């Protein structure tokens, strides 16, 4: 999982990427290609 300040570029890496909020943190998840996971921080 990558940790980045800004998730905009990570969201645009794949068309299936979704931005979700869990426990006060912002994540990018991808159900089809799981290597595109990221967390904001």
UniProtKB/Swiss-Prot annotation:
GO terms for cellular component: ribonucleoprotein complex; ribosome. InterPro entries: Ribosomal_bL36, Ribosomal_bL36_sp, Ribosomal_L36_bact. Transmembrane segments: none annotated. Keywords: Ribonucleoprotein, Ribosomal protein. Disulfide bonds: none annotated. GO terms for biological process: translation. One of its GO terms (molecular function) is structural constituent of ribosome. It comes from the Bacteria. HAMAP family: Ribosomal_bL36. Belongs to the bacterial ribosomal protein bL36 family. PANTHER family: 50S RIBOSOMAL PROTEIN L36 2, LARGE RIBOSOMAL SUBUNIT PROTEIN BL36B. This is Large ribosomal subunit protein bL36. It comes from Ruegeria sp. (strain TM1040).
């Amino acid at each position: 999982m990558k940790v980045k300040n800004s998730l905009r570029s990570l969201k645009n890496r794949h068309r299936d990427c979704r931005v979700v909020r869990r426990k006060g943190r912002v994540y990018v998840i991808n159900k089809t290609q799981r290597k595109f996971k990221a967390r904001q921080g």
